[in-house]
Amino acid sequence: MNIKITADSTCDLSEELLRQWNISLMPMHILMGDDTYLDGVTIHPADVFAHVDAGGQTPKSAAANPVEYIDFFEPFAKEYDAVIHISVSAKLSSCYQNACLAAQEYDNVSVIDSENICTGQGYLVLRAAKWAADGLTARNICMRLQNLANRVELSFVLNQLNYMAKSGRCSGVLAFGANLLGIKPSLAIIDGELKVVRKYRGSLPICVGKYITDLLDGRDDIDNSMVFISSCQPKPGCMEAIKAGLRKYGKFENIIETDIGTTIGGYSGPGTIGIVFAKKV
């Protein structure tokens, strides 16, 4: 069975992985100032950071509309026996709803709610591509993805709250206080939504080390076959702290490093770093 895997650009997989596994992305719309850009195509995190650092507001993201999804799916629906599109969490965006509406135009397009974002979504996308390469049927892959979605854990540590404040996701006073006290919040996807789960204090590398210990120490329920390290212009020492923690606690067989894209990076800001893995069945 000839199966095509597609996803929303929020999955933040590298160009190398996309080429290797023949994965195609539907770009999110990024609204910055008076202009609209396509995530990963006409705008990248560095562009957002330069805009915000120059005094501009953080960008807003918007889903592609159903007609755009129809146009996106059409060539793949004609070329492949089946198309499986893995969407950003339905609780975070209307991408899933719009993709489902578009999929109704085709008999061979399925849409899966990843219940995640960034490489939490990317974890499912890469698994789907590997299963397709192994010869699984589209029905089997979709069933596996639905079972996997609520076992994927995404979390990260923010270096600052300035970008969250500018986007309206926290108050400027809270951001100022957190930055003044050196507080680094840790966010995670819980039930398809981003929530603050812990707060650390100190330099970012020290906070990252504590974050990894809290996340992995003493656990025996983790699937150690694959882990993502996702970062956005990581600060010195942070990548080393993450990898040291993974070696100590995780014993992961495959460590994949990826860059956080425009959609999440525009809210979290530079310095953000985290990991993604799945729990055992």
Language-model segments: residues:
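Mixed-charge interfacial surface used for oligomerization/domain docking
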Residues: 4, 10-24, 29, 35, ...
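Short beta->alpha junction loops
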Residues: 63, 113-115
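Short, contiguous strand/loop micro-motifs
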Residues: 1, 59-60, 86, 161, ...
